[in-house]
Amino acid sequence: MAVGAEPKAAVRETVKRNIMTLQPVDVTWRFAGLQEYFRKLMPFFLKNLRHDKIFLSAGSLAFQTLLSIVPFLAVTLSVLRIFSFFASLNRYLEEFIFQNFIPSAGEDLRIHFEAFIGKTSTVPLIGGLLLFIIALSLISTIDRTLNDIWKVRAPRKPIQAFTLYWTVLTLGPVLIGSSLGASSYVWYTVFTEGPLLELKIRLISFLPFVNSLLSFLLLYMLVPNRRVKLPHAFSGAVAAALLFELSKKWFVFYVSRFATFEHIYGAISAVPLLFFWIYIGWLVVLTGAELVFSIGNVLSSSVEPVPKRLLPGLTQLFSVLGTIWRAQQDGSPVHIGTRVVRGALSATAADRIVDLLLQKGVVHETSGGELVVSADLYQMTLFDLYGLIPWELAVHEDLEGYDDDGSETFASLEKDVTVCLKETMAVPVALLLQDSTNQCI
């Protein structure tokens, strides 16, 4: 036994020595990969900011919010008034909104808000229904804008969207009211004396940041019609919350030191002042959303471009459709939340192709969230499939600014190519899929 133990000990020493030798290399490799990741993140992030035109989107959202904020708050508070338990919390909810989301310089705005919201309680039934529709339209616009950032081309189904918006308008105030009720009880019964009172004072200073952080986190996790990883959403929420707190301090400094709005607009300065603050808020929200999207997609976007092909986009479209079709044939359809294709095709590109297939009615989503082929692939030819590819999916990014000045010159040539392609590709898609399946077997 002693003789056999010596070789084992020697082997262990050799393995240990090799591992110790490899550790610095592994750490260096990981550090280099992390460095490369952050090197690509910022250009990709800035590119998305320009491409999605967030300054224009923030202005559009700010204008609609300015028109909808009073109806939205009126609907929120009216939902709480339905429940007698929450009736006493309306004041706390107003305090919560103004202390956490509106700068301290907005006391005049608060007075106007209270007057406007007080008048909405006397609105008749039809007027109340109109307020509810306006509030729903604001949520719908927010949903559509954030999904545009995530490149979601297939919108939610009308019933699914209405259910989501209805839940936000009804259960949202109830959850906020319950949270405020529970926190108020603990706040005024537990944190009243001694060290706990000092802790209470410290917690108050962090409360606005924590509230902003949780709001952004839920927004980035739940609104996009895509699976967003928690670390990515949390990173973007932290950045957005920090930007939001800095924006509040800058806004207070600007309003208190430079009374530009009062000099220009006089008595009605509260309106442009509110619009300016809402615009800054939406700019922060969209910037955080772009950061969350960039963190999750920067690696897939940095994949080396494939060589230009005669039929750009068709191979990828055929691959995604084939994956969905084979999974359906095997009796285990692909779920909408899972990655459809693995390999060189990035998750973002695959999601865009799935959205395209959903829009064109080639596939549809079942009530269980599964992707199923809708079209008759024995009638659909390869040319029909090729015709579904939009221009932005077919071209490379370096051709985004390409301007076809010779469209008239190449009109006849394009017609000849189309006829040739139509004749050559007059092959049922199902036959090709069956052939590729047999080759895989």
Curated annotation (Swiss-Prot):
Q: Which organism is it from?
A: Chlorobium limicola (strain DSM 245 / NBRC 103803 / 6330)
**Name of protein:** UPF0761 membrane protein Clim_1521
Pfam family for this entry, one: Virul_fac_BrkB
**Keywords assigned by UniProt, alphabetized:** Cell inner membrane, Cell membrane, Membrane, Transmembrane, Transmembrane helix
What transmembrane ranges does the database entry give? Answer: 54-74, 122-142, 161-181, 203-223, 233-253, 266-286
Keyword Nucleotidyltransferase belongs to the record: no
Q: Where in the cell is it found?
A: Cell inner membrane
One Gene Ontology term, aspect cellular component: plasma membrane
What taxonomic ancestry is recorded?
A: Bacteria, Pseudomonadati, Chlorobiota, Chlorobiia, Chlorobiales
Per the record, membrane topology reads: Multi-pass membrane protein
